[in-house]
């Protein structure tokens, strides 16, 4: 089943979670064992610049599964607090994209059911395309997985 954003952020980070640093060029991550993807958390989202919706993509590549993209978007509350929203899209549905999108596009979406991935599949995190000067910088990324 899918998760609400509150449920997603309440998931405890288990042993074996991979904590990595992202760059604008992206990075790949392959656990080498069959695993279940629970989610991806990012810190320092305000470091993402040059894009109207301030989002970056998390993609899981696999030969027998649709490409799935976690789209992390920032939104500012009335008091100036910046919050992160995480939405999972699959390749068979249209994911918002482009410099014209705003965080409001992501506000009511919820994650889809998560899948299990084989050891030969890898995860890639990189900055969203579009806009100028898009960069994640030294944003901290925590990939939350459970080995099977």
What are the residue ranges of the model-derived segments?
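Surface-exposed, low-hydrophobicity beta-strand/loop segments enriched in small/polar/acidic residues
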Residues: 2-148
């Amino acid at each position: 089943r899918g998760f609400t954003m509150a449920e997603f952020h309440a998931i405890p980070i288990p042993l074996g979670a991979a904590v990595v640093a992202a760059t604008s060029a992206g990075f790949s991550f392959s656990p080498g064992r069959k695993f279940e993807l629970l989610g991806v958390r990012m810190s320092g989202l305000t470091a993402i610049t040059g894009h109207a919706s301030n989002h970056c993509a998390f993609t899981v590549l696999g030969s027998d599964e649709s490409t799935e993209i976690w789209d992390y978007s920032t939104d500012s509350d009335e008091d100036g607090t910046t919050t992160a929203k995480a939405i999972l899209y699959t390749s068979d549905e249209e994911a918002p994209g482009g410099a014209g999108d705003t965080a409001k596009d992501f506000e009511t979406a919820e994650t889809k059911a998560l899948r299990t991935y084989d050891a030969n599949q890898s995860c890639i995190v990189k900055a969203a395309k579009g806009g100028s000067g898009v960069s994640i910088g030294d944003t901290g990324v925590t990939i939350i997985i459970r080995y099977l």
